[in-house]
Amino acid sequence: MLKVSDFDHIPVLLYPTVDALNVRPGGIYVDCTAGGGSHSAEIARRMKGQGILVSIDKDDAALAACMERKEDFAGIDWMPVKSDYKDIDDIIRSLKIGKVDGIMADLGVSSYQLDTAERGFSYMKNGPLDMRMDPDEWLTAAEVVNRYSRDELERIFRDYGEEHHAGRIADGIVERRRTKPFTRTTELAQAIKDYMPGHGRGEDQHPAKRCFQAIRIEVNHELDGLETLLNDGIRKLKPGGRFAVISFHSLEDRIVKEAFRSAESPCTCPRDFPVCVCGKKSLGTVITKKPIEPTEEEIEINPRSRSSKLRVFERNDNEQYN
């Protein structure tokens, strides 16, 4: 079994995120991305031995490492759940815990996943083309790279990676796999670099970064699941409950920003209407008008935190959409 000491992960925006939840003893809290348990443990510490904490992850190794911390927090009903965060509605219903006081999600890939070559997430480490957050799922990065059509590859590179050279890279991958399928991460990373104009020179990041992000999102259906999590999670909060989400790239951040904005101002009436007639009322307030970002000190300690953004929503007592 993986131990906490083995799960090398530096949490991002740890204290700002848990501060935003206003954790109190006796409350009910859900960590949708347990990882190695750093955020869950800080929530548990502030619960002072009272309440319910649900830690969700679809990665067995991450969940095992998280739950090793449980013995340090006697009195808390700490529940591990192996699942996808998009199923938050079903999870909360099945646990029969009713509405909750706080929900958080850290959408980044963990340091452990990136640094473990066998998981296939990193373009810097030689490993199998996998990228599954849940190893029990069937779709792998190799399946995407070797079996998707040229147009499908261009779409995911463009839409999920915001890659300017999506078409050219897709052409190169399709041409190359005709003679030999891609099986290793560094092999694909080098090919992507070779297919880019100027071989990626002048880039402020590795030429393969955006394409690897795109493939990972496709393999794990991350963006579809995120929209479901946000919409269902907001409706599972008690009045005054908080939802805190850490994103790591512009696609995620736009989805979080829009979901929170729509929940705060859902009215669909034309702007020239003097009063609202659609009947859609606000579900709460966006606490972070601008996202909270890591300090320079945190970035120096953990460079992977550089692109992170924290947004927070607070629920009101309107029950209209529940």
Located regions from the model:
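S-adenosyl-L-methionine-dependent methyltransferase catalytic core, i.e., the SAM/SAH-binding region
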Residues: M1-N322
